[in-house]
C-alpha cells in the first residue's frame, strides 16, 4: 500500500496469534528506494474461555479451559480475587491442569491467558480469562 507523507501505518483484520512480516520501501517521484529489512511481529492470542473449575478431592483443584491458537498457557491461582498478592503462576501446553497445593476448606480463584512465542522466543500474551472461584474440599 502507499501512504503519503506518513511515518506510521496501521494494518487491520489480522488473525489472532499469528506472525506477520513486513518490508518498507520509500518512493519519491516514482523512483523506488531499497526495501528495508524485514520487520516481524506477532498478534496477541485470543482471550481464553473457562470450561470448569472443580475440587473433587482434598487439596486438589481441577481447572479446564477452551483451546485457542497459541504456543501455551499461563495460569494463576490465589486466595484473593484481585491476584495482587498470595498467588502462584505456572505454564502449560495442556487445556486441563490439576493444582495439588491448595489448602482444604479455603476458597481459591483461578484464571488463565494464552501466549505465543515470537521469533526471538519472547512471549506475547493475550488477555486474562474471567476469574473463576472454587472452594477446596
Give, region by region, the residue ranges found by the protein language model:
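Long alpha-helical scaffolds
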Residues: 26, 48-51, 70-71, 78, ...
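Recognizes extended acidic, P/S/T-rich segments that occur
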Residues: 1-15, 74-103
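Beta-strand-rich modules
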Residues: 11-30, 102-120
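Conserved hydrophobic/aromatic "anchor" residues
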Residues: 20-22, 65, 73, 83, ...
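Pro/Thr/Ser/Gly-rich low-complexity, intrinsically disordered linker/stalk tracts
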Residues: 16, 31-68, 123-137
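Non-catalytic surface loops within mature trypsin-like serine protease
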Residues: 45-46, 67-69, 79-81, 101-103, ...
Amino acid at each position: 500500500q502507499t501512504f503519503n507523507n506518513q511515518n506510521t501505518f496501521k494494518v487491520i483484520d489480522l488473525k489472532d496469534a499469528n506472525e506477520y512480516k513486513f518490508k518498507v520501501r520509500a518512493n519519491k517521484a516514482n523512483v523506488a528506494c531499497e526495501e528495508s529489512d524485514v520487520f516481524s511481529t506477532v498478534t496477541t492470542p485470543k482471550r481464553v474461555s473457562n470450561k470448569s473449575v472443580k475440587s473433587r478431592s482434598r487439596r486438589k483443584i481441577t481447572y479446564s479451559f477452551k483451546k485457542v491458537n497459541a504456543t501455551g498457557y499461563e495460569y494463576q491461582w490465589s486466595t484473593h480475587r484481585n491476584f495482587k498478592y498470595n498467588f502462584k503462576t505456572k505454564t502449560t501446553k495442556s487445556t486441563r491442569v490439576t493444582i495439588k497445593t491448595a489448602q482444604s476448606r479455603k476458597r481459591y480463584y483461578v484464571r488463565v491467558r494464552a501466549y505465543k512465542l515470537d521469533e526471538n522466543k519472547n512471549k506475547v500474551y493475550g488477555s486474562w480469562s474471567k476469574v473463576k472461584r472454587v472452594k477446596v474440599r
